[in-house]
Amino acid sequence: MDLYKELVNGSGYAVHPIENMQLFKKLRDSFVDKMNISTKSEKNIDVVRKVMAKMSKAEINRSMINLLTFTNLSDMMINSCPSLVETLCGKELFIQRRAHTIINVPGKEHSKQWPHYEMMSGISPFTYVLWAPLHDIEDDGGAYHIDQKASLEV
């Protein structure tokens, strides 16, 4: 598959495996640690997800502020998929020190599309969004793709 053609002329997205899963797991563990909402004995993403589902907006905001100290998140994400990033962007990159992070929590006031809004915001024709869940996806209820051609008709 020609990745660039698929993104620009095809469906508008591509599913790609994480190349360095060990580093990606370290990224996930660092994320959990920086959120600072689980106990020392239960520092895992599933505990964080359960706790966050019951948190108020103010509590979630405090946890998001804690993430501001995670200044190497972008680097870790890039190094988790180095050949993908190099294929799309080349070797010289301009990256954000603090990665853009959105937390999806249950409830009517939270849109399921919110975590994916940056894909359609028109940031730049030269911007690519790397999206990777920090938890296992057990079914297709939490992840879905909208074909680029179909989305243009909406």
Regions inferred by a protein language model and the residue ranges of each:
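Non-heme Fe(II)-dependent double-stranded beta-helix
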Residues: M1-S11, H16-P115, S121
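Catalytic core of non-heme Fe(II) oxygenases with the double-stranded beta-helix
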Residues: E109-V154
